[in-house]
Amino acid sequence: LKEHTLDELATWFKNHHLKPWAYNTLIFFNQRDEAGEKEIDDEVDFILKVSKAIGMKMLITVPSFDVKDKTISEIKEEAVARLRYLSDKVGEDMKISLEFCGAPNCSINQFGTAYDVVKAVDRPNVGITVDTFHFHEMCSKLEDLKKADGNKIFAYHLNDCEDLPLGSCGDDKRLWPEEGVVDLSLIHI
């Protein structure tokens, strides 16, 4: 929208077969100070404006990194509160999908933790994104995935990973499906 207007973008989508599916991604939605929460609010206001204009119905959000000295319980409790707040802000017509990130310093870095948060939020428009790279990277448990309600999985990112020690890979180590070591056939509902 730096070189074109929102109306031009909306017209383009209206006149083409390609349709927007999700805003990927609202980064670092949790564990923010007051100024950071204001930044998130402003970004969500912008996302909502664009989404309404182009018919986009989902917002994928990523948790914060490097939240020193916070317990898992504290992180979950605060994430639940923030996602409920965001759920109210976007309204029931837009979904929010929490994408856990498979990095040791991510505040929500395993499927089980993310799913616990989504269950506690207990809103029909809040679910989870499963990224097979992140699932593999922090050794998320297949048992947790198998127990999950498939209706709460809103997005699925299909990726593979280089054969490196778990927890050591950044996004630059992503590969196309079946080019790496992730057994993609297992990561499903």
Please tell me what each predicted stretch does.
Residues 19, 57, 154:
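Short acidic/polar active-site loop segments enriched in Thr and Asp
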Residues 21-30:
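N-terminal small/glycine-rich loop or linker at the start of catalytic domains
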Residues 23, 85-181:
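Acidic/histidine-rich catalytic cores of soluble enzymes
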Residues 187-189:
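Conserved small/polar residues in nucleotide/adenosyl-binding loops
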Residues 14-16, 29-127, 137:
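Active-site acidic/histidine proton-transfer and metal-coordination neighborhood
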Residues 27, 63, 160-162:
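Short, small-residue-rich loop/turn micro-motifs
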Residues 1-8, 66:
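Glycine-rich, proline-tolerant flexible connector loops at the mouths of alpha/beta enzymes
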